[in-house]
C-alpha cells in the first residue's frame, strides 16, 4: 500500500463581527504587520536618504591655464596664463611658452580617458627654476542622474632645492564632494569661471584667493598625483619643460534617491522581516482556533456520519 496523492482539507472558523474571535484576529493581524515596520526602522536602513552610484564623468580640458615658475633669485618669477587681463598685469614677468595638449579615448566610449599635456617655457641661461605652480581648467559633466555641469581645476605644485629642467606629472583628476547631489534635473550652480578673467585686479589671480572661492563649492576636483618627477639640469638655451599625463577616473557620487527608489528599498526590507512574522503568527492562529480558545463555529469539509 502506498500513497498515490494527497491534498490538505480546509477547515473554516466562522463568527460574528462583534465577538472575541474577531477581536483576537484583529489583534493578531496588528502584531503581524506593524512590528516589522519598527524592527526595520530601528535597524537604521529603512529609508535610504542618501546613496552612492558610480559614473564615468565627461571631462574636457578647456585649454585654459595659469602658470607661475619661481626662479632662484629671491622674489623673481616668470608667468603665463590664457587670460588677457592677467597677462597685461604681469607684463614684466610674462613669457609665452609652447603648449601642446591632446585627450585620448582608449576604450572608444565617446568620453575622454586622459589628458596629455606638454609645455615648454623659454628661459634665459641665467634663470633657474626652483618651483612650479600650475592650474589647468576643465569642463566637468555628469549625466546619469542629474545633469550637472561645472568648471573645475587641477592644481600641481612643486618646490625643489636644486634648479630643474623638467617637471613631469602622472596622476588622476579626482572629485571631492561635501553634500549629496540630486537624482534628477539640471544643476548649473558651479558652471561659472573658477578664475575671474575679466578682473583687472592682481588679487583676483592670486592662488590663495582662487582656492578660497573654489573650495566653498559642494563639488570640486583635485589632482591626485603621487608620482611627480623633478629633473635637475637644463642645457644652454633650452626651455623648462612641464609634461603631464592626467587620467580621468570613474568616480563614486553621493546623491539623494527618488521616491520610488525609497519605496523599493523599504519594501524589500519590510517583506523580508514580515515573512518571519507571518510564519510565526500563522501557527499561533491555528493553535488558538483549533483548540477553541475563543468560541467559533467550525465548518469542516466532510460530514460526520453516525455509526449504525
Residue map of PLM features:
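N-terminal pre-first-transmembrane soluble regions of secretory-pathway and organelle membrane proteins
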Residues: 1-94, 293, 297-306
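Short, charged/polar micro-motifs that form catalytic or ligand-binding hotspots
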Residues: 20-24, 103-108, 270
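Eukaryotic basic, amphipathic alpha-helical target segments in cytosolic regions
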Residues: 38, 42, 125, 140-146, ...
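Non-cytosolic ectodomains/luminal loops of secretory-pathway membrane proteins
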Residues: 48-255
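Long, compositionally biased interface segments
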Residues: 218-308
Amino acid at each position: 500500500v502506498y500513497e498515490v496523492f494527497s491534498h490538505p482539507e480546509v477547515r473554516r472558523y466562522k463568527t460574528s463581527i462583534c465577538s472575541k474571535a474577531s477581536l483576537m484576529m484583529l489583534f493578531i493581524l496588528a502584531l503581524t504587520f506593524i512590528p516589522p515596520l519598527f524592527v526595520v526602522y530601528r535597524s537604521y536602513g529603512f529609508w535610504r536618504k542618501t546613496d552612492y552610484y558610480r559614473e564615468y564623468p565627461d571631462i574636457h580640458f578647456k585649454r585654459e591655464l595659469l602658470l607661475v615658475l619661481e626662479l632662484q633669485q629671491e622674489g623673481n618669477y616668470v608667468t603665463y596664463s590664457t587670460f588677457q587681463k592677467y597677462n597685461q598685469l604681469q607684463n614684466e614677468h610674462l613669457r609665452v611658452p609652447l603648449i601642446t595638449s591632446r585627450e585620448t579615448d582608449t576604450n572608444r566610449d565617446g568620453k575622454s580617458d586622459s589628458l596629455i599635456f606638454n609645455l615648454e617655457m623659454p628661459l634665459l641661461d641665467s634663470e633657474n627654476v626652483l618651483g612650479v605652480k600650475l592650474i589647468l581648467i576643465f569642463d566637468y559633466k555628469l549625466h546619469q542622474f542629474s545633469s550637472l555641469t561645472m568648471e573645475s581645476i587641477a592644481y600641481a605644485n612643486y618646490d625643489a632645492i636644486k634648479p630643474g629642467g623638467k617637471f613631469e606629472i602622472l596622476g588622476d583628476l579626482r572629485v571631492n564632494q561635501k553634500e549629496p547631489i540630486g537624482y534628477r534635473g539640471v544643476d548649473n550652480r558651479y558652471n561659472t569661471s573658477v578664475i575671474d578673467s575679466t578682473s583687472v585686479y592682481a588679487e583676483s589671480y592670486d592662488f590663495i584667493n582662487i582656492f578660497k572661492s573654489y573650495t566653498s563649492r559642494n563639488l570640486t576636483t583635485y589632482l591626485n598625483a603621487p608620482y611627480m618627477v623633478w629633473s635637475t639640469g637644463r642645457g644652454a638655451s633650452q626651455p623648462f619643460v612641464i609634461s603631464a599625463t592626467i587620467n580621468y577616473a570613474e568616480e563614486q557620487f553621493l546623491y539623494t534617491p527618488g521616491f520610488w527608489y525609497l519605496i523599493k528599498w523599504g519594501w524589500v526590507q519590510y517583506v523580508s522581516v514580515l515573512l518571519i512574522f507571518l510564519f510565526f503568527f500563522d501557527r499561533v492562529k491555528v493553535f488558538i482556533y483549533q483548540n477553541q480558545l475563543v468560541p467559533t463555529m467550525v465548518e469542516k469539509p466532510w460530514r460526520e456520519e453516525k455509526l449504525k
